Regions:
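Tryptophan-anchored aromatic micro-motifs
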Residues: 14-41
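Short, solvent-exposed coil/turn segments at beta-strand boundaries
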Residues: 20-27, 48-57, 130-139, 157-159
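Contiguous, well-ordered beta-strand patches that form the walls/edges
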Residues: 33-39, 57-132
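A mature extracytoplasmic/lumenal domain signature
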Residues: 32, 55, 60-62, 143-145, ...
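Bacterial signal peptide processing site
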Residues: 9-12
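C-terminal motif of bacterial Sec signal peptides marking the signal peptidase cleavage site
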Residues: 4-7
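Short, exposed beta-strand-loop hairpins at the edges of beta-sheets
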Residues: 120, 129-152
Length: 159
């Protein structure tokens, strides 16, 4: 299984080595809303998401190893067509101008990387759109196009 994350911004946002906006914080606390009870990759009861930009990993704060996922940042142009409509709809609802939007693809443990290191369009399964605002102090994580893992996480940065 692979989930995808890409990066885009209204302005010029500097990037971390993994392609995420430099305003991304390492830990967010908040609340999780799921339209299903089938959270595939993360614990449905989570109130935390942690990012490690040096390892390109995201976790739900449970410290369960299977809930620590490696991701790859993709550009919006690299998204599979079935994800682009929902991504555009979500971007259209953004009111704050201090916003960075990016997408991540989760890489399964059994996946052999492509020669160019990119997740191909055919390998995209779950895609997560991440919206940062307030200089990265606020976050919204939305799943795109995966009927088994529909959720939204809203949170604020914590040290």
């Amino acid at each position: 299984c692979i989930a995808i994350l890409t990066a885009c911004s209204g302005g010029k946002t500097s990037k971390n080595a993994d392609g995420t906006p430099s305003t991304l914080k390492s830990r967010y606390l908040g609340y999780y809303r799921s339209d299903t009870d089938n959270a595939t990759y993360f614990d449905e009861t989570t109130n935390e998401f942690d990012f490690d930009v040096n390892k390109s990993t995201i976790s739900d704060g449970t410290e369960i190893e299977s809930h620590i996922k490696t991701y790859q940042v993709l550009s919006e142009d690299e998204l599979a067509s079935n994800f682009k409509g929902q991504a555009e709809k979500n971007k259209g609802e953004i009111k704050n101008t201090d916003t960075a939007v990016f997408y991540i693809g989760l890489i399964s443990d059994d996946r052999n990387g492509n020669k160019d290191g990119k997740i191909s369009v055919d390998e995209q399964r779950s895609v997560y759109q991440i919206i940062l605002s307030n200089n990265g102090n606020s976050i919204k994580i939305l799943s795109l196009g995966d009927d088994w893992d529909q959720f939204a996480f809203t949170g604020t940065a914590k040290d």
